[in-house]
């Protein structure tokens, strides 16, 4: 399992709460949501750099990118698009107030627009692993999302697979052996291929994490262009300033059975 299982009663209680809160928010006049032109969703295996990229995109004045809200889950529960947009904006505000912290890192970008926006054009969610797990459980969700959350633009961040696997295998939260982590990743990538088969090529953007770290300004500008927004120089400089020049090298921390 990727995450500890949540008791069914608690999951249903959270959905009921979110339905009521987002329903009330959706009834209010929200001219700020009227300009949304694209929906951005992440897709892929964990520990590949999705959280950093999502936090940097959320720092853009015309974008809101939530942290692991789980859009497919809400669409499966029959939430309206407007309700989901309200939940995404609220999630981004909370994450910004917390400093966009993830594991041991803060992805806060001082002086930029995390948790708020101006002239909103793009809204989405950073939950690449969660998206694939939702589709594994409900294969019809991809088609539903493409219909109800259109137009959807996907971002897939990839990293040296040995580093990503080692990060999962050494995580105290996940508690997976290297062999189980490998099997888990294989399942995710099989699902990823099924999803890719339903997407137009121009709706999937591949971003290599190591290349991003080498040239964060250039790669971030390319990502913004894919999403249809300009990338101001001040925004790019502020985002590049928080990026580590070298990722944690974790592949040497675990040993795998050669036969695995």
Go through the PLM ranges and name each one.
Residues 1-115, 239-256:
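PAPS-dependent sulfotransferase catalytic core
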Residues 117-234, 252:
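PAPS-dependent sulfotransferase catalytic domain
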């Amino acid at each position: 399992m990727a995450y500890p299982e949540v008791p069914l009663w608690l999951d249903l209680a959270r959905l009921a709460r979110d339905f009521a809160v987002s329903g009330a928010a959706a009834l209010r006049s929200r001219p700020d949501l009227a300009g949304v032109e694209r929906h951005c969703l992440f897709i892929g295996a964990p520990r590949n750099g999705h959280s950093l990229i999502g936090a940097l995109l959320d720092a853009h004045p015309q974008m809101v990118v939530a942290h692991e809200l789980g859009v497919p889950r809400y669409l499966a529960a029959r939430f309206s698009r407007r309700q989901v947009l309200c939940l995404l904006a609220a999630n981004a505000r909370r994450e910004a107030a917390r400093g966009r912290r993830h594991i041991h890192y803060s992805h806060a970008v001082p002086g930029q627009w995390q948790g708020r926006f101006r002239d909103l054009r793009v809204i989405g969610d950073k939950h690449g692993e969660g998206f694939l797990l939702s589709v594994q459980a409900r294969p019809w969700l991809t088609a539903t999302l493409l219909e109800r959350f259109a137009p959807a633009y996907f971002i897939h961040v990839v990293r040296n697979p040995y580093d990503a696997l080692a990060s999962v295998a050494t995580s105290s939260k996940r508690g997976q052996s290297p062999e189980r982590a490998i099997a888990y990743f294989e399942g995710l990538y099989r699902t990823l291929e099924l999803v890719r088969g339903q997407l137009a090529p121009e709706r999937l953007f591949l971003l290599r994490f190591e290349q991003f770290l080498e040239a964060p300004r250039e790669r971030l500008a390319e990502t913004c262009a894919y999403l249809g927004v300009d990338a101001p120089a001040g925004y790019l400089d502020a985002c590049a300033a928080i990026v580590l020049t070298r990722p944690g090298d974790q592949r040497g921390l675990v040993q795998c059975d050669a036969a695995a």
